[in-house]
C-alpha cells in the first residue's frame, strides 16, 4: 500500500507507476472518492460541534426554546447516523482502491509491459556439454524408478511423488537450505501452510492473485503458496524497537498453488505442480533505502551461493516494470539452465518492497527519535523443490542414467550418486 498523503501530493508519480506496471486503476476516481471521504468527515465534525453546543445550551434555555433545541439535536443525530453509514461504505471502497495502488519502481528497472523487457545482468557457469544423448528429467524419473505414477490417480493432475534416493534427495535439499540460512544468521522457522485472509492482503497476494490460492472449506483460512505470507504477518500490529532490526528469517513450509491460468504449461514432470516445498528468505529492515539495498544484496548473494554449491549454471535477470508486480521496488530473478529445453527457467525471485507490504500488514518500529514508522520488507527464495530437482537431475546426469550428487549435498545423502529404485 502507498501512503495516501503521497498519492495526494504526487498524483503524477502514482499515475506513472500505474502506467509502468500495467495496473487497472482509475486514479482520478480514487482521488475523487478521497475528497468525498474528507468532506463527509468534515461535515460529521461540524455536526458533532453543533451537538456539543446544543447539549450545553439545553439546560440553560428557557422552556419555550428547549424543545426546539432538542428537536434540532435529534435532527443532527439522524443526519450524523446517515453520514456515518455513507462514510463507512465510501471508506471501504477507498480501501479497496488503495490496495491496488502500485509502488513506483526503482529508477534502474527496465521499462516494458511484460517479461520480454527483462534484462540479463549476469551469467555464471556454462551449460553442460554431454558426450552422450542426455535425457529430460521425466525420462530420468522413469528410467530410475524415482517417480510414483500411481499418485495421479489418487491426487489428480499436477501432483507428484518421489521414490528411493530421489525422495531422500528432496528432503536433503530442504535441510541443506535451512542449514545454509542458519549459518548466515537467519532464524530458521518451520511454518504452517495456511493463513487468514489478512495475511494474504498483507503480502499483496490478495486481492490480485486470489485465484491462485485454495480456500479451506468451512474456515476463514487459505493454503499458502509461500512461507512469505506467514513470515510477513508475524509482527503485524507490533511496534518493534529499531535495535531489533533487521529481522532475518528463513521459513520452511509446504506450499500450494492452484496454477489457475497455466493450462497446457509444463504438464509433464516436476516443473509446475500443485504442492511443493519451499525455504523462503525474509527480511524486515528500518525505513532506509540504504538498509533495504544492503538486505537485497544479501538475499541475492545467498541465493547465488546456494546455486553455486549445487553446481548449477544460472543467470540473473533484472525484471521489468510490467513484470515485477505492483508492490515491488526492485526485483531480480535467478534462472537455472534446463538442458532438455535449451533455456533458463526461474528458480528464485528476489524482491524489495519498501513499505508497501508493511503498510498493508501494519509492520512498524520506533526510530531513534521516538517516531513510529513503517518498516521495509524484502524476500527471496532460498530453495524450492521439486523445481530445482529438474535442474539437478538434468545437469548432473551420467551416461548410465544415474545422477551425480553435488559435493555440498554428499554429507546429507551419504553417497556420491543417486541410485535407481528397483
Where do the language-model regions lie?
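N-terminal alpha-helical targeting/anchoring segments
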Residues: 1-128
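TRNA-recognition modules of translation machinery and tRNA-sensing kinases, especially anticodon-binding
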Residues: 121-422
Amino acid at each position: 500500500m502507498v501512503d495516501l498523503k503521497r498519492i495526494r501530493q504526487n498524483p503524477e508519480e502514482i499515475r506513472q507507476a500505474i502506467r509502468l506496471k500495467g495496473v487497472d486503476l482509475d486514479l482520478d476516481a480514487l482521488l475523487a472518492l478521497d475528497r468525498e471521504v474528507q468532506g463527509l468527515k468534515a461535515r460529521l465534525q461540524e455536526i458533532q460541534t453543533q451537538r456539543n453546543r446544543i447539549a450545553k445550551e439545553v439546560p440553560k434555555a428557557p422552556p419555550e426554546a428547549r424543545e426546539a433545541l432538542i428537536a434540532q439535536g435529534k435532527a443532527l443525530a439522524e443526519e450524523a447516523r446517515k453520514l456515518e453509514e455513507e462514510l463507512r461504505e465510501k471508506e471501504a471502497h477507498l480501501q479497496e482502491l488503495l490496495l491496488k495502488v502500485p509502488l513506483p519502481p526503482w529508477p534502474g528497472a527496465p521499462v516494458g509491459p511484460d517479461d520480454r523487457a527483462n534484462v540479463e545482468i549476469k551469467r555464471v557457469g556454462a551449460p553442460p556439454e554431454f558426450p552422450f544423448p542426455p535425457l529430460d528429467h521425466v525420462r530420468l524419473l522413469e528410467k530410475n524408478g524415482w517417480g510414483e505414477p500411481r499418485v495421479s490417480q489418487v491426487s489428480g493432475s499436477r501432483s507428484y511423488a518421489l521414490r528411493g534416493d530421489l525422495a531422500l534427495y528432496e528432503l536433503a535439499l530442504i535441510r541443506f537450505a535451512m542449514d545454509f540460512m542458519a549459518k548466515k544468521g537467519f532464524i530458521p522457522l518451520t511454518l504452517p501452510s495456511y493463513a487468514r485472509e489478512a495475511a494474504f492482503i498483507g503480502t499483496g497476494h490478495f486481492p490480485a492473485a486470489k485465484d491462485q490460492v485454495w480456500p479451506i472449506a468451512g474456515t476463514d483460512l487459505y493454503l499458502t503458496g509461500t512461507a512469505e505470507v506467514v513470515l510477513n504477518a508475524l509482527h503485524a500490529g507490533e511496534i518493534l524497537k529499531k535495535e531489533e532490526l533487521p529481522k532475518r528469517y528463513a521459513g520452511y513450509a509446504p506450499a500450494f498453488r492452484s496454477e489457475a491460468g497455466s493450462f497446457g504449461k509444463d504438464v509433464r514432470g516436476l516443473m509446475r505442480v500443485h504442492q511443493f516445498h519451499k525455504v523462503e528468505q525474509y527480511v524486515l529492515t528500518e525505513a532506509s533505502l540504504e538498509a533495504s539495498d544492503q538486505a537485497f544484496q544479501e538475499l541475492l548473494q545467498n541465493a547465488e551461493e546456494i546455486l553455486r554449491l549445487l553446481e548449477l549454471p544460472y543467470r540473473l535477470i533484472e525484471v521489468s516494470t510490467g513484470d515485477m508486480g505492483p508492490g515491488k521496488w526492485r526485483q531480480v530473478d535467478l534462472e537455472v539452465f534446463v538442458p532438455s529445453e535449451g533455456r533458463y527457467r526461474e528458480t528464485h525471485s528476489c524482491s524489495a518492497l519498501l513499505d508497501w507490504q508493511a503498510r498493508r500488514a501494519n509492520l512498524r518500529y520506533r526510530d531513534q527519535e521516538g517516531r513510529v514508522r513503517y518498516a521495509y520488507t524484502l524476500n527471496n527464495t532460498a530453495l524450492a523443490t521439486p523445481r530445482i530437482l529438474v535442474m539437478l537431475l538434468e545437469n548432473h546426469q551420467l551416461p548410465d542414467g544415474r545422477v551425480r550428487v553435488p559435493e555440498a549435498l554428499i554429507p546429507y545423502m551419504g553417497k556420491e550418486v543417486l541410485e535407481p529404485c528397483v
